[in-house]
């Protein structure tokens, strides 16, 4: 080292770093600092700026003395000669710490990479599962919809119900309506439906099988039904209902002329003909009201009291009249034999269906037109019956009270065949409500059990044999003209 009094001196710097040794000259005036020395060493050895190193020098004994401050550098310059030998010692502990930190960072990077890979795999799996479930959910409704379509097509392809089942239901739907119509509204059937529709086939014609089968389920009425209803009045006979669901016989209020034939039912036919009645009552009831109340549509002239004389075929359905000498059980008719004084056979068949209609205003006071002697019509009783024995009907028929009885049906004055104002049947006119009591000339047989005695017709009431005692005058006001009227 060069000593000078303020003069610049030069010092040779020898620096060592591991295997690298370098020399340089330092020009200073004994004012060199440690920082200047560190910068020169870094520049000389090409050390990085962030390098953490320590400078040490060798003294005279050969020891390495650390240069930590500027005073240490000044002492090294005074004690050493013209050459300053500096050794660069790098702090390995700090470097090792940094290296460890770097390794940890690298490990962390690897771990993060692994986690990212696992997360990506999980995300892919979840996305795949979700996609699979979504695809399954989307495909399942399509399959069910397809199944529904196939099921619907199978239903559409099924054949319709067979036609016989529909045909089998037709009688069940039609017949109750007919039955209900004739059961619940018996008085209005003739007014609502034309008379031609009520025509029932004569007894000699066979009723179709479909009607027999449709109405065969209803049992025929028992025999005890006839005569079960008590008479409303003791003066006239009451006739129970026969095979028809109609209002009770006790209702003798004066209804319209069209409804009277339902209230006054026909008397029961002879006991011998119950088999024919019980075999066909329901068929007649469901088809035509004239058949309900005693027989087919009339073929004779109209009677005075609104009835029609039944044709010859009426006896075939309700039974033929009994033989001679035997009284008829259905109406108490006398036998045909001369000792009894009754009318000839055939003049007292089954009673007409509408035999007790209320008389019309035009039917009183005049004799009826001549009638035919068709078999089955009522023959008038003889003239020599006891007067006053003609049973008058009750006053509920609507006729004014007459001198002959409560109903105004008493006998007319003797010899007056058609006196005005008389309500009884005229001379020679049929009008007897029943057979006269036995004993007189022309008396009928005793009435059956359960029927009250019936009075005899007034004198002069006999008509032509075979004539209709219930024939009414032509063109009676308030009555419908039947197409079968002769």
Curated annotation (Swiss-Prot):
Keyword ATP-binding: no
GO cellular component: cytoplasm; endoplasmic reticulum exit site; endoplasmic reticulum-Golgi intermediate compartment; mitochondrion
Main location: endoplasmic reticulum
PROSITE patterns: PB1 (PS51745)
Residue segments, region Disordered: 197-486
Any single GO BP term: negative regulation of apoptotic process
Domain PB1: residue ranges: 10-91
Protein name per Swiss-Prot or TrEMBL: Protein tfg-1
Organism per entry: Caenorhabditis elegans
Gene: tfg-1
